[in-house]
Curated annotation (Swiss-Prot):
This is PC-esterase domain-containing protein 1B. SUPFAM superfamilies: SGNH hydrolase. Residues 264-293, 398-432 are annotated as: Disordered. The lineage of its organism: Eukaryota, Metazoa, Chordata, Craniata, Vertebrata. Belongs to the PC-esterase family. InterPro entries: SGNH_hydro_sf.
Length: 432
C-alpha cells in the first residue's frame, strides 16, 4: 500500500468538499483525515477518546456535542467541520442509517453553497442493537430507502463510498449499548455485523455505489481494538485513511506516486493484549498523476497552493524523472532513502508501515492488503507478481463493471470511469 503524505493528501483533496456520516468509529475517520490534511502524525489515544469537543485540530463543533447535553441516546447529535483555504470536511453523527434527521442532512447538502464531491458513510451498530425487536427488518428497509434517496439527491459528479462496518471484539462494552443490554447483545453482535455488512454492501452495489470492505481489511487486526471492543487505535485509523484515499484516487483517475510501499502495516500474529485507548467520479476531468515523491518530508510540499488572492488552481504534475533500467531477471527495489513521515506519542520510522497481499484489488493497480494482519516493523521486500490462479475475488467492490489493468503493477493514468447512476426523471431544481 502506498502511504500518502500530508502534502499529497492536500493535493488529492484540493478544492474538494468531503462529507463523512456515521457513528463514533467514523468520527475517528473524520479526525484522522482532518489531521492528515495538516500533519504527518497519528491520532493520540486522548484525541480518539474525546467526543463532542468544541475544537479539534483547527476544526469547529457546529452543532450538538458539548454545545448541548452529552448522552448516549438515539437523538444524540454532533456536527463538526474543518475548513481551510482549499478544503472542506464535514462530519455528521448518525444513530440510524435512514431517518428524518438524515433527510434533513441531505436537504442541507442539496441547498448548500457547495455540492459534496465525496461522501463517506456507514451506519450499522446502532441500527441493529438499539431499535427493538424489529431492528433487522427496519435496517433492511432503511438501507433501500437510503440508497434510493442518495441516488436522487447527490449529483452524478459526487463519489459515494459505503464502508462496511469494522469488526467488533468478542466482548462489546461500547457506550452505544445501555448497561442492561451489553451482556445480552455482545454475545451475537460480532456475527450480526457480518450479516449486516453483506446486506448493506449488496444494496449499495445494486444502486451503483462504491463499497469499501473495511471489515475484510481489518478482520485479523483485533489486537488493535480498544478495550471496549468497538474502537481502534491511531495506527489502524491511519491505515483506514490510506485505504479510503487510494480508493478515491482510483475512482477519480488520479495516479498515485510510484514508490515502494513503506513498512508492513498488518501481518498475522498470535493474539495479544488489546491496545488501550479510548466510480462515480467527475467524468469531465482527465486523469492527473500526483507529483513524484520527495526525498525527505522536510522539503517543500509537492504543490504549493496559491495565496488567497489568486484563483484556485487544479492539480499540477511536473515532468517525471527519467526511468531507471533494470535487468529483466532482477526484482525492482525502492529508489531513494526511506521516508520518516510520522511523529506521535510513539516514535517510529515509515518502514514500519507496509501492506502486502497475495490478493491484488482490481480497483487499485499496485495496491495490496494482506489477508493476515498485524502492526509491526518489517524489512523492505521486493515485488514479485502473484500467479493468476492464486488471486481470489477483489474486496473493493464497484456497482458496475470496471476496466482491469493487465497486471497488478500497471499504473492507472486513466480518465475517471463514467457513472452508471441514472439521473432522476424529474429532478428537483437546486435552491438558489
Amino acid at each position: 500500500m502506498i502511504l500518502l503524505r500530508a502534502s499529497e493528501v492536500r493535493q488529492l483533496l484540493h478544492n474538494k468538499f468531503v462529507v463523512i456520516l456515521g457513528d463514533s468509529v467514523h468520527r475517528a475517520v473524520y479526525k484522522d483525515l482532518v489531521l492528515l490534511l495538516q500533519k504527518d502524525r497519528l491520532l493520540t489515544p486522548g484525541q480518539l477518546r474525546a467526543r463532542g469537543e468544541l475544537n479539534f485540530e483547527q476544526d469547529e463543533l457546529v452543532d450538538g456535542g458539548q454545545r448541548g447535553h452529552m448522552h448516549n441516546g438515539l437523538n444524540y447529535r454532533e456536527v463538526r467541520e474543518f475548513r481551510s483555504d482549499h478544503h472542506l470536511v464535514r462530519f455528521y453523527f448518525l444513530t440510524r442509517v435512514y431517518s428524518d434527521y438524515l433527510q434533513t442532512i441531505l436537504k442541507e447538502l442539496q441547498s448548500g453553497e457547495h455540492a459534496p464531491d465525496l461522501v463517506i458513510m456507514n451506519s450499522c451498530l446502532w441500527d441493529i442493537s438499539r431499535y427493538g425487536p424489529n431492528s433487522w427488518r427496519s435496517y433492511l428497509e432503511n438501507l433501500e430507502n437510503l440508497f434510493q434517496c442518495l441516488g436522487q439527491v447527490l449529483p452524478e459528479s459526487c463519489l459515494l463510498v459505503w464502508n462496511t462496518a469494522m469488526p467488533v471484539g468478542e466482548e462489546v462494552t461500547g457506550g452505544f449499548l445501555p448497561p442492561k443490554l451489553r451482556r445480552q447483545k455482545a454475545t451475537f453482535l460480532k456475527n450480526e455485523v457480518v450479516k449486516a455488512n453483506f446486506h448493506s454492501a449488496t444494496e449499495a452495489r445494486k444502486h451503483n455505489f462504491d463499497v469499501l470492505d473495511l471489515h475484510f481489511h481489518f478482520r485479523h487486526a483485533r489486537e488493535n481494538l480498544h478495550w471496549d471492543g468497538v474502537h481502534w487505535n491511531g495506527r489502524v485509523h491511519r491505515c483506514l485513511s490510506q485505504l479510503l484515499l487510494a480508493h478515491v484516487a482510483d475512482a477519480w483517475g488520479v495516479e498515485l506516486p510510484h514508490r515502494h510501499p513503506v513498512g508492513e502495516w498488518i501481518k498475522k500474529k498470535k493474539p495479544g493484549p488489546r491496545v488501550e485507548g479510548p466510480p462515480q467520479a467527475n467524468r469531465n476531468h482527465p486523469a492527473l498523476p500526483l507529483s513524484p515523491p520527495l526525498p525527505s518530508p522536510t522539503y517543500r510540499p509537492l504543490l504549493g497552493f496559491p495565496p488567497q488572492r489568486l484563483p484556485l488552481l487544479p492539480l499540477l504534475s511536473p515532468q517525471p524523472p527519467p526511468p531507471i533500467l533494470h535487468h529483466q531477471g532482477m526484482p525492482r527495489f525502492p529508489q531513494g532513502p526511506p521516508d520518516a513521515c510520522f511523529s506521535s506519542d510513539h516514535t517510529f520510522q515509515s518502514d514500519q508501515f507496509y501492506c502486502h497481499s497475495d490478493v491484488p484489488s482490481s480497483a487499485h493497480a499496485g495496491f495490496f492488503v494482506e489477508d493476515n494482519f498485524m502492526v509491526g516493523p518489517q524489512l523492505p521486500m521486493p515485488f514479485f507478481p502473484t500467479p493468476r490462479y492464486q488471486r481470489p475475488a477483489p474486496v473493493v467492490h464497484r456497482g458496475f463493471g470496471r476496466y482491469r489493468p493487465r497486471g497488478p503493477y500497471t499504473p492507472w493514468g486513466q480518465r475517471p470511469r463514467p457513472s452508471k447512476r441514472r439521473a432522476p426523471a424529474n429532478p428537483e431544481p437546486r435552491p438558489q
